[in-house]
Design a protein with these regions (language model features):
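Solvent-exposed, non-transmembrane regions of membrane-associated and secreted proteins
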Residues: 11-234
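N-terminal export and membrane-targeting signals
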Residues: 1-9
């Protein structure tokens, strides 16, 4: 009798884990992606509703680089942007919110912004964290990034495009990856970086996997989505 109960309990535990890691996780991921896509559409609709008449284009002039506008720091768990990484799929679109606590941001929302990090497009390091497994696993495929892959951050006003440069594996206490110049805390900010952090290896907290990128351009919403959004989509 006891043996049967233990076997039943074991089966139930296995089913729960299977649900948590695979079936439930896929459902959660689809929900987050759908919510982010809906938010993207809402931002575009709000822009279209308030859009002034566009001036006639000057065929003789080259498009000028646009300086990215400053964004205010978000509150804890405040959704302020979406992330698109074409390498992870054409429909990859995840919310970014303030803070990196599991309870408030990483578990219920998706991608978290380190409170002391700069905002997208600013001089310094725009640093983010997300799960690699469970809760929608936004950074599940972080190790699949390739040199020059686009990492696009969408805000209500436009898109900030970064380009992936390299991966690194560190111990959890190596916080210098979050410095204004990653891994060089003694230096002042000399560029515009993005840093993505997650746990490594899979299903472990032993290390951190870190992806670094550099800022390429800002595309205001009136110019339309950047071509980078569809580059190399899996």
């Amino acid at each position: 009798m006891i043996g049967e109960l233990l076997m039943t309990a074991g089966v139930l535990v296995f089913l729960f884990v299977a649900w948590q890691l695979w079936i439930g996780d896929e459902i959660y991921s689809a929900q987050r992606t759908a919510q982010a896509a809906e938010q993207s559409e809402e931002w575009q609709a709000e822009f279209e509703a308030s859009r002034p008449p566009a001036p006639e284009p000057d065929a003789a002039s080259e498009p000028a680089a646009v300086e990215p506008p400053d964004m205010p720091k978000p509150g804890d768990a405040e959704w302020f942007a979406n992330m698109h990484i074409p390498r992870f799929g054409a429909d990859y679109n995840y919310p970014i919110a303030g803070g990196v606590t599991r309870a408030n941001t990483l578990d219920p929302i998706g991608i978290g912004h380190y409170n002391d990090a700069v905002m997208p497009g600013q001089l310094g390091n725009f640093a983010l964290a997300a799960h690699r497994t469970t809760y929608g696993k936004p950074f599940n495929r972080i190790a699949d990034l390739r040199l020059n892959d686009a990492i696009v951050v969408e805000s209500p006003n436009g898109w900030y495009t970064y380009r992936f440069r390299t991966l690194e594996y560190v111990t959890p206490d190596e916080v210098d990856v979050l410095s204004e110049v990653p891994q060089r805390p003694e230096l002042p900010a000399d560029g515009r970086y993005i840093t993505l952090t997650s746990c490594s290896p899979m299903f472990s907290l032993a290390e951190r996997i870190v992806a670094y990128g550099v800022f390429e351009s800002y595309t205001p919403r009136e110019a339309g989505p950047p071509a980078a959004l569809t580059e190399g989509a899996a």
